[in-house]
């Protein structure tokens, strides 16, 4: 098509013809970002960042503001959809070797970190029981940092405990960070288009490319419609599916919930954190659970980019997925046998993937050499 008219070359974005549905989650993430920014703006108009009024203002939004319940529930459910899409997006990157495009991968990890920070600050804003206690537990981890810890925590809290200044600055951060996410997303996309997408085979796509529109744009549209359908079904029939029952009670510093846990999308990191009995060790493991993703491009040893034709690596990858799900499940349970042992085992298995993957790459190289 492009050969027939040279002017079309500059107008069409050439994309590999064999990229599968796993490549559509990037555009779905963009849809989620747009949805979150829009609904977040309308919620911010009616929200009050004050410890005496925050909980009431959320109730006011859902009860009194026209279509406020749609805005509030869409914002909460889209956050979960955002994380489902981003975890699938990362898993695809690990499976198909997309991390070898270093700039794209590293900006992606920066995006994930910023997104997690934004979601954490957002979870505190309704000022419910679980919001308050999750914020207390997580921010308290800063005290584990030698020398600076206590000063940093006091500075973040704006006092000697989580109070009104904390909520005000968390709201300010929750409002400003999405703009950083938008900026990082732009860099992420620019860097991707600098080299181009990989494909399921892990080969160079230059020999077989088709125009992005209409072929891949309609595929993106289909996935967007699927995403919106799932969101609307959840919104209509199960609006509180991802909410914690504790968060329907106003924050009370005098009553501790029986089991403090963050939102489901942080449970894998939280599970790793509490599987280590030492405070500093747990905080380091929590940080490393995200930062370890940055090692992937530098430890790739296999001759082939993708795991499509690497059965040993595939086994390791699906073990990682099972580990991730198990860690998430175990983190919802109290810290007692057998859940503590399950958390510790899965935490070791999670980090083992990033050590074993390069080792398996070398083993597979040797097997190919001698066959």
From Swiss-Prot:
The chain crosses the membrane at residues 25-45, 69-90, 105-125, 170-190, 218-238, 280-300, 312-332, 339-358. GO terms for biological process: mitochondrial electron transport, ubiquinol to cytochrome c. Heme b b566 binds at residues 89, 188. GO terms for cellular component: mitochondrial inner membrane; respiratory chain complex III. Gene3D superfamilies: Cytochrome Bc1 Complex, Chain C. A ubiquinone binds at residue 193. The keyword Metal-binding applies. GO terms for molecular function: metal ion binding; ubiquinol-cytochrome-c reductase activity. Coiled coil: none annotated. Binds 2 heme b groups non-covalently. Its cofactor is heme b. The cytochrome bc1 complex contains 3 respiratory subunits (MT-CYB, CYC1 and UQCRFS1), 2 core proteins (UQCRC1 and UQCRC2) and probably 6 low-molecular weight proteins. Belongs to the cytochrome b family. This is Cytochrome b. The lineage of its organism: Eukaryota, Metazoa, Chordata, Craniata, Vertebrata.
């Amino acid at each position: 098509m492009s050969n027939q008219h040279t002017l079309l070359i500059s107008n069409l974005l050439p994309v590999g013809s064999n990229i599968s549905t796993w490549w559509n989650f990037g555009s779905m993430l963009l849809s989620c970002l747009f949805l979150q920014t829009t609904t977040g703006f309308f919620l911010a108009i009616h929200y009050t960042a004050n410890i005496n009024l925050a909980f009431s203002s959320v109730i006011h939004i859902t009860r009194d503001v026209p279509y406020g319940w749609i805005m509030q529930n869409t914002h909460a459910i889209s956050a979960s959809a955002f994380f489902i899409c981003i975890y699938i997006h990362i898993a695809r990157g690990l499976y198909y070797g997309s991390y070898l495009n270093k700039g794209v991968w590293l900006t992606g990890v920066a995006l994930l970190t910023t997104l997690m920070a934004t979601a954490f600050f957002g979870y505190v804003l309704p000022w419910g029981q679980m919001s308050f206690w999750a914020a207390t537990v997580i921010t308290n981890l800063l005290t584990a940092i030698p020398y600076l810890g206590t000063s940093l925590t006091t500075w973040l809290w704006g006092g000697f405990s989580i109070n009104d200044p904390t909520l005000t600055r968390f709201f300010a951060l929750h409002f400003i960070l999405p703009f950083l996410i938008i900026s990082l997303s732009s860099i992420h996309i620019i860097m991707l288009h600098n080299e181009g997408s990989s494909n399921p085979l892990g080969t160079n796509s230059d020999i077989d490319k088709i125009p992005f529109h209409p072929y891949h744009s309609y595929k993106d549209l289909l996935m967007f419609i699927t995403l919106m359908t799932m969101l609307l079904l959840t919104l209509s029939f199960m609006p509180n599916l991802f909410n914690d029952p504790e968060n329907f009670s106003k924050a009370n510093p005098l009553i501790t919930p029986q089991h403090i846990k963050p939102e489901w999308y942080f449970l894998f990191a939280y599970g790793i954190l509490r599987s280590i009995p030492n405070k500093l060790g747990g905080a380091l493991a929590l940080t490393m659970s995200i930062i370890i993703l940055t090692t992937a491009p530098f430890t790739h040893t296999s001759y082939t980019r993708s795991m499509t034709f690497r059965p040993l690596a595939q086994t390791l990858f699906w073990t990682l997925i099972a580990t991730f799900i198990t860690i998430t499940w175990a983190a919802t349970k109290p810290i007692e046998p057998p859940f503590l042992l399950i958390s510790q085992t899965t935490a070791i298995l999670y980090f083992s993937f990033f050590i074993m993957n390069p080792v398996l790459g070398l083993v597979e190289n040797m097997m190919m050499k001698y066959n």
